[in-house]
Regions:
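Short, solvent-exposed beta-strand/turn "edge" segments of beta-rich domains on protein surfaces
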Residues: 25-39, 50-52, 89-91
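A structural detector for beta-sheet-dominated domains
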Residues: 17, 22-24, 29, 55, ...
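Short, surface-exposed ligand- or partner-binding patches at beta-edge/loop junctions that are enriched
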Residues: 96-129
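Short edge beta-strand/loop segments characteristic of extracellular beta-sandwich folds
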Residues: 41-45, 101
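Envelope-exposed proteins and targeting segments
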Residues: 15-24, 36-40, 56-58, 96-98, ...
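Glycine- and small hydrophobic-rich membrane-insertion segments that are intrinsically disordered
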Residues: 1, 86, 119-121
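The feature marks short-to-medium sequence segments in extracytoplasmic or secretory-pathway proteins
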Residues: 45-96, 131-133
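N-terminal Sec-dependent export signals
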Residues: 1-16, 28-31
Length: 134
C-alpha cells in the first residue's frame, strides 16, 4: 500500500525567508483508527544562523477539495516514516527530509500541500499537488 510519487506540479520547491522547502513525495497509510492518511515528505533546509526545526520554522497544511485536512496520528507507520522528523533541530546549511501525516477526506481527490514561513508577514508559499487516486 506504500506508494512513492513525485509532485504532479513542477513548483513544489522554493525559498521561504531563510529556509528552503522541497516537497519530495507522498505515501498512503492508515492511522490508528484505520482511516486513510497521506504522509507528505519534504526536504527542509535551514539557511538561518540559528539551529531550528521545520515545526518551528514552517506551517505546512494539506487540502482536499479546498478543505483543510486534519493531522494524522500513526501507530503502525510505514517504513521510512519518522513522526519526529519535523521536530529535529538542524544547523545552518543542513537539510533534513521530514514527514507530516494528514487524514484524507477521500482517496480520489488530489491533495494540495502548502508550506509557509511560520513567523513572517510574507505571503510567499511553496505549493504542490499530488494526484493520489489509483
Amino acid at each position: 500500500q506504500q506508494q512513492e510519487s513525485t509532485p504532479s506540479s513542477p513548483d513544489g520547491e522554493g525559498t521561504l525567508g531563510k529556509y528552503a522547502v522541497k516537497f519530495t513525495g507522498y505515501t498512503l497509510a492508515k492511522d490508528y483508527q484505520g482511516q486513510d492518511t497521506v504522509i507528505i515528505s519534504f526536504d527542509f533546509t535551514n539557511n538561518n544562523e540559528n539551529a531550528t526545526s521545520a515545526m518551528v520554522a514552517l506551517n505546512i497544511d494539506a487540502y482536499q477539495d479546498g478543505i483543510e485536512l486534519e493531522s494524522a496520528i500513526l501507530t503502525d507507520a510505514p517504513e521510512g516514516y519518522d513522526s519526529e522528523s519535523e521536530m529535529k533541530n538542524i544547523k545552518q546549511g543542513a537539510t533534513l527530509n521530514c514527514q507530516k501525516a494528514f487524514v484524507l477526506s477521500n482517496t480520489s481527490s488530489p491533495v494540495g500541500v502548502e508550506a509557509e514561513e511560520l513567523f513572517s508577514f510574507s505571503s510567499d508559499k511553496v505549493v504542490c499537488t499530488y494526484a493520489i487516486a489509483d
